[in-house]
């Protein structure tokens, strides 16, 4: 993995400002100050229902397309994690008074849905290395967001920890760095240009920011003064 480690380090360095905008997003501060109305939490759950449902199909697609590569075991684990997340999300939805039928008719927000649309694009047109590289950069960021959100929901909204398993799955996700690095290296060895790994990570991280911007907008949280 001699090529991959410095490549990922450069990507992370290049995306530091974007990472800071996500981790310091005003939406999290609003949650921690109980300024997000409980009804707006339903928006988060409704959007995640569409995202996770889409990502399940996308991971199944990349597994179908490139399932003869060594990366198949990685994608099987990711697929199982997404399935568990969808079940946990439905438990959270029930706590907020939402039925599965409510989630299925919840209208996707374009800015919130961009993330899973790009994951689907990578699964259809990209490589396992591009998607693994994008996840390698993005999922730790998403996990940190989930950690901050579960703490706020438990402390400020009195939501029982037992119903916050959706956030636990991502916030406490075991490290998959070595597996993802190996997949990226395998892609480079097959001739994949480094710029495509960088592009996939940059785009997905940008769509992550768009998701939180959409959540802030839906909750009437000003995006300036992020903290």
Predicted regions and their residues:
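Accessory, usually C-terminal, subdomains that scaffold auxiliary metal cofactors
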Residues: 179-191
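Acidic, carboxylate-rich catalytic segments that either coordinate divalent cations
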Residues: 194-227
């Amino acid at each position: 993995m001699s090529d991959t480690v410095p490549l990922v380090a450069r990507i992370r360095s290049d995306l530091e400002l974007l990472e800071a905008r996500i981790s310091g997003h005003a939406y999290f501060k609003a949650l921690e100050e109980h300024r997000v109305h409980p009804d707006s939490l339903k928006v988060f759950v409704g959007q995640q229902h569409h995202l996770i449902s889409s990502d399940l199909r996308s991971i199944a697609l990349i597994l179908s397309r490139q399932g003869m590569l060594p990366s198949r075991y990685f994608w099987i684990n990711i697929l199982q994690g997404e399935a568990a997340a969808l079940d946990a999300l439905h438990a959270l939805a029930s706590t907020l008074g939402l039925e599965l039928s409510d989630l299925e008719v919840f209208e996707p927000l374009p800015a919130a849905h961009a993330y899973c649309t790009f994951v689907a694009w990578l699964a259809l047109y990209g490589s396992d290395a591009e998607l693994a590289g994008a996840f390698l950069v993005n999922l730790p960021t998403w996990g940190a967001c989930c950690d901050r959100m579960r703490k706020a929901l438990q402390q400020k909204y009195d939501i029982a920890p037992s119903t916050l398993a959706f956030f636990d799955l991502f916030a406490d996700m075991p490290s998959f760095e070595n597996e993802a690095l190996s997949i990226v290296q395998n892609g480079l060895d097959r001739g994949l240009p480094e710029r495509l790994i960088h592009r996939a990570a940059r785009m997905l991280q940008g769509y992550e920011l768009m998701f939180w911007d959409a959540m802030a907008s839906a909750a009437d949280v000003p995006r300036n003064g992020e903290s």
